């Protein structure tokens, strides 16, 4: 049976950046990775209703810098910056180093796979029909300029006894084209019948040239080898 590679993982370093951008030696790596996980867990719990798309973590010179990409920056910042200060203290306590928090606004939440998946799950939890939720997400994405979108839901759809999978696609979603800018994410809806999984793929176009490459010193051109002609015996 054919299996699909993770659309984001296969594109890392080609057209997709990493969510954690830091280097560490062997002794510190595991601790940094663990604190990254705990920081993300803490922020996702605190900002559950703030439409957080992704959290990028950097570690410059014994400190931690967290960039929160959100569709609702006002909820994250809070009144006079009180909420963001509380988050900064929480992150600094978990990481054990001074923390800095930056907020980046997501201009078009309808073209962000994580926010689209979360929107569908919240509708499913409010007992909206799954087909209507899927169609609405697809129409909004295509209206705002997506080249293609695919939405898949799986579980006890509509309270059915037997779990099944249904999907809806519009436009093209080329998973094998590495230069294709495909945003992929998942979410879970916890309903009275059980958990319903939601997957979203959004194709935004092709990125020609890829990510900015690190310039390397040019090697001297190799001299072409002279071919010796064998004389006739």
Swiss-Prot record:
Protein name: Small ribosomal subunit protein uS3
PROSITE patterns to which the protein is assigned, alphabetical: KH_TYPE_2 (PS50823), RIBOSOMAL_S3 (PS00548)
Keyword Zinc: no
One GO CC annotation: cytosolic small ribosomal subunit
Gene designation per UniProt: rpsC
Domain KH type-2: 39-107
GO molecular function: mRNA binding; rRNA binding; structural constituent of ribosome
Described purpose of this protein according to its UniProt entry: Binds the lower part of the 30S subunit head. Binds mRNA in the 70S ribosome, positioning it for translation.
Superkingdom of the source species: Bacteria
The organism's taxonomic lineage, starting at the top: Bacteria, Pseudomonadati, Pseudomonadota, Gammaproteobacteria, Enterobacterales
């Amino acid at each position: 049976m054919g299996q699909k590679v993770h659309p984001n993982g296969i594109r890392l370093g080609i057209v997709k950046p990493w969510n954690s951008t830091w280097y560490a030696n062997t002794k510190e790596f595991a601790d940094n990775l663990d604190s990254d996980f705990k920081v993300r867990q803490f922020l996702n719990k605190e900002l559950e209703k703030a439409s957080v798309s992704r959290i990028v973590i950097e570690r410059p010179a014994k400190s931690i810098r967290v960039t929160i990409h959100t569709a609702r920056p006002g909820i994250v910042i809070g009144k006079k910056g009180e909420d963001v200060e509380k988050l900064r203290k929480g992150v600094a306590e978990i990481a054990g180093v001074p923390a800095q928090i930056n907020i980046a606004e997501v201009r078009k939440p309808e073209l962000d796979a994580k926010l689209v998946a979360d929107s569908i799950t919240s509708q499913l939890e409010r007992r909206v029909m799954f087909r209507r939720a899927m169609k609405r997400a697809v129409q909004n994405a295509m209206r705002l300029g997506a080249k293609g979108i695919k939405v898949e839901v799986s579980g006890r759809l509509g309270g059915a006894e037997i779990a099944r999978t249904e999907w809806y696609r519009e436009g093209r979603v080329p998973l094998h084209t590495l230069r294709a800018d495909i945003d992929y994410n998942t979410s879970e809806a916890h309903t009275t019948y059980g958990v319903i999984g939601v997957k979203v793929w959004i194709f935004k176009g092709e990125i020609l040239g890829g990510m900015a490459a690190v310039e390397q010193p040019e090697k001297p051109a190799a001299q072409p080898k002279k071919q010796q002609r064998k004389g006739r015996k």
